[in-house]
């Protein structure tokens, strides 16, 4: 049996996740008339956990002493989009002022149609490797 080699698993040898370019809307066009691509960068597990934790709220069950945890999926989606989109700069005061938005979260919702927003969320999930199903991972491991 071949000795296990852990070199590929060392941090310095791991391939860093790449940013992706994604045209979130056909309505934003460059000088060449082509849709402008947004730049989406993946986040770390720690950043994702912090975003998820911000969107968990503990509340009391009425009439009992029990608590339940509620997860705000819509706000999580908005927060992860804002964390991953690096271009355009959603924190730009000029851009927010143009749309009358206060904050990156409100800005991205105002900039995009509901369908574009949902597609952008899917692109953000893909950039963070949430799109690979378990069946596909098992097939890769078997081969």
Where are these regions (language model features)?
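Short, surface-exposed, charged amphipathic helix/loop patches that serve as local interaction elements
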Residues: 32-143
């Amino acid at each position: 049996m071949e000795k296990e080699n852990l070199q590929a698993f060392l941090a310095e040898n791991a391939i860093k996740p790449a940013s992706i370019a994604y045209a979130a809307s056909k309505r934003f066009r460059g000088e060449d008339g082509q849709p402008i691509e947004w730049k989406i960068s993946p986040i770390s597990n720690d950043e994702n956990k912090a975003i998820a934790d911000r969107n968990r709220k503990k509340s009391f069950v009425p009439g009992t002493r029990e608590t339940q945890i509620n997860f705000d999926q819509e706000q999580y989606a908005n927060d992860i989009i804002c964390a991953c989109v690096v271009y355009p700069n959603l924190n730009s005061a000029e851009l927010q002022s143009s749309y009358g938005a206060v904050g990156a979260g409100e800005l991205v919702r105002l900039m995009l149609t509901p369908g574009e927003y949902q597609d952008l969320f899917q692109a953000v999930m893909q950039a963070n490797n949430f799109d690979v199903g378990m069946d596909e991972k098992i097939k890769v491991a078997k081969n």
